[in-house]
Amino acid sequence: SKEGMSYEEPENDEGVACTGQYAESFCLNGGTCRYIQSIGEYYCICVGDYTGHRCEKKQV
């Protein structure tokens, strides 16, 4: 339910772009850092064959 929310922006599971040191160094191997405000978690959108929470693993 949307009651009590003061902003119009829809909830988005992709989160928002990370800032500061997280944007710089949280994701490895070219991954894009995202922050999910509702749960206070950072995660990475990986590129190529990389996987893992911080794109630290390469799939074979």
Curated annotation (Swiss-Prot):
Pfam families: EGF. InterPro entries: EGF-like_dom. SUPFAM superfamilies: EGF/Laminin (SSF57196). It is found in: Secreted; Nematocyst. One of its GO terms (cellular component) is extracellular region. Has both toxic and EGF activity. Its EGF activity consists of rounding cells (morphological change) and inducing tyrosine phosphorylation of the EGFR in A431 cells, but with a lower potency that human EGF. This is U-actitoxin-Avd12b. It comes from Anemonia viridis.
